[in-house]
């Protein structure tokens, strides 16, 4: 009498995520050169490159204006190499990198309509905070002669960026750059990437929006430093966008809030002439 056949076990399925996940499970540090390490590097580039291109183009433009040569003076009269023209180049590089690299591929299904109103509220609050130093009643309360400095900065910025100086097409490109390109690039860099990357290079192993006080405050501080003389409102803005990101766990909510702030500032400077914020 033949023994009954014992069914063989079903073949094991590969782990979700493909070979990279098989090489290193979530939470396990990736070995240098491993598939997981390469995947993390690609994700880091997708999050950081648009913002870094923006900063690089901005620094190159500033360096261009510092070169004391007759060639530079002649080139400054060319529209493409004016401040507004250089800003258009920044915008094209940043927006092109965003569309090419698509960092949102690492945040599938993150946006929820319920986050629209909180994001717009945060954006409006940050706008009010940002624009407050330019208000006349606030200038009278400053313990230093801030009003004169603001007026000087406004006059210099108006000469570079106002539609009367640049034309409406370049002004519209500037609005696109500040209201969409850099707003989105900054949130994918500061909140979606750096908040986690300062804790581990394997940043995708950390859940989106996970709160970690030291990294949260550090990122807000560096975000503030990026904004130079407006570091104080910059720090508070970094806290506001960061809190929204942590509470919603949605990078799109932070992007929308940042875009709302910048677009409101664009409308504000056009209506009031406070070009120092532009």
Sequence positions of predicted segments:
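Alpha-helical transmembrane segments in multi-pass membrane proteins
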Residues: 43-104, 110-123
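N-terminal membrane topogenic signal
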Residues: 34-50, 210-211
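Juxtamembrane helix-loop-helix connectors linking adjacent transmembrane helices
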Residues: 74-80, 107-183, 199-208, 275
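Short, Lys/Arg-rich, polar N-terminal cytosolic tail immediately upstream
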Residues: 2-5, 13-40
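Transmembrane helix-loop-helix hairpins at the membrane interface
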Residues: 161-278
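Structural signal for the C-terminal ends of transmembrane alpha-helices
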Residues: 96-108, 129-134, 244-248
């Amino acid at each position: 009498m033949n023994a009954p056949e014992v069914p063989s076990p079903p073949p094991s399925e590969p782990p979700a995520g493909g070979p990279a996940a098989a090489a290193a499970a979530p939470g396990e540090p990736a070995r240098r050169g491993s598939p997981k390490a390469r995947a993390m590097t690609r994700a880091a580039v997708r999050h950081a490159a648009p913002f870094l291109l923006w900063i690089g183009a901005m620094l190159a433009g500033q360096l261009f204006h510092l070169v004391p040569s007759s060639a530079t003076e002649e080139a400054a009269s060319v529209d493409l190499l004016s401040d507004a023209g250089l800003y258009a180049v920044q915008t094209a590089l940043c927006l092109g990198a965003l569309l090419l690299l698509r960092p949102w591929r690492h945040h599938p299904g993150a946006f929820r309509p319920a986050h629209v109103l909180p994001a717009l509220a945060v954006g409006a609050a940050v706008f009010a905070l940002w624009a407050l130093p330019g208000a006349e009643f606030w200038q009278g309360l400053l313990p230093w002669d801030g009003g004169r400095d603001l007026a000087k900065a406004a006059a210099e910025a108006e000469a570079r960026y106002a539609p009367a100086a640049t034309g409406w097409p370049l002004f519209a490109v500037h609005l696109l750059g500040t209201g969409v390109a850099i707003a989105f690039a900054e949130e994918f860099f500061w909140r979606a990437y750096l908040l986690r990357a300062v804790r581990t290079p394997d940043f995708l192993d950390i859940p989106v929006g996970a709160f970690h006080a030291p990294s949260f405050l550090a990122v807000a501080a560096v975000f503030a430093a990026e904004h130079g003389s407006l570091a104080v409102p910059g720090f508070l803005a970094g806290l506001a966008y960061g809190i929204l990101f942590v509470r919603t766990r949605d990078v799109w909510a932070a992007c929308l809030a940042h875009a709302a702030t910048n677009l409101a500032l664009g409308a504000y400077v056009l209506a009031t002439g406070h070009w120092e914020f532009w």
